[in-house]
Amino acid sequence: MTIDAALADKIRRTPKAELHVHIEGTLEPERIFRLAQRNNVKLAYPDVEALRAAYAFTDLQSFLDIYYAGASVLLTEEDFFDMTMDYVKRAAADNVRHAEIFFDPQTHTARGVPMGTVIDGIADALAQARTEYDFSSSMILCFLRHLSEEDALATLEAALPYRDRFVGVGLDSSERGNPPEKFARVFARAKELGLHLVAHAGEEGPPQYVTDALDILKVERIDHGVRAIEDEALVQRLARERVALTVCPLSNQKLMVHPDLRDHPMKRLLDAGVAVTLHSDDPAYFGGYMNANWEASFDALPLDAADAHKLARNSFEAAFLPDVQKAEFLAEVDHFWSATPASPPATANVTTTT
């Protein structure tokens, strides 16, 4: 199927919020090599092309192996600043108006990089981006689920001197064998501190992980969550409680969660009333930032202009923003979709190849 040209133009230009992006996953090969040279870090690949060629993942773990190797070049505040500004420029070009950025401090503190170096480098770039690009943002500290809960608790405590620089906590890394309940205490502690709560669940893990993230960790959003489609009662609950799913289609395709995007459940979830939102996850590794994810989804699935409006709205409704700012963004989205002529439904303007 091929997306209607007018609709393609509109989804590129619509205001969007990005709620599922790992800042370490925005490190392009060129930036990795520049930082390696600056910091005298030896890489296992001779050049940019060889590194890019290594991005042939078969599952989440094979991706994580190279992801952590790439992060090894991040050593100074300047490194984190430069990486973050690279992302902001790409996101702003895709009409991302607000981003809630995941960062993985354990990836860096385990290498001897101070917590403050990580947080200050990212936060300073985001502060500059607000002025230079009118780019709204916040930060979400993620725990690595393949590590222990004790390590997560220590990480949270170490980050508390920088509490004013992040708005929530999340849970990422390898889902298999690391159920949500493993982190019940650290999420309870974060809730006591008034932090927002999100967690990756139902990507490679079963639908039960989505339920457990909601009931045990008390999360407000589910990152990925696509396997919820396997449980009708869970889908109904997500719709009823307006729990947003931060879906990342190109990531799902690259990691073989859904190798063929025509089989992706996002449209079925959206039609069932679930607050689906679209994001890039680790765009440097998965070959696509926000607009690429939107375009691939609309190319593969019978999504139309009404769906696009809904997806854009959902992204801001699910954001951890003050009510006034959220209302302003929603008004901006509604004005965009009402002020420009609506394109016909994508289902009426597609060509299908078999």
Swiss-Prot record:
Species this protein is from: Cupriavidus metallidurans (strain ATCC 43123 / DSM 2839 / NBRC 102507 / CH34) (Ralstonia metallidurans)
Q: Where is this site: Important for catalytic activity?
A: 224
Q: Name one GO cellular component term.
A: cytosol
Tagged with keyword Ubl conjugation: no
Pfam families attached here? A_deaminase
This chain belongs to which protein, by name? Answer: Adenine deaminase
Q: What is the lineage of its organism?
A: Bacteria, Pseudomonadati, Pseudomonadota, Betaproteobacteria, Burkholderiales
Annotated residues that bind Zn(2+) are located at 20, 22, 200, 281
Q: Which GO terms describe its molecular function?
A: adenine deaminase activity; zinc ion binding
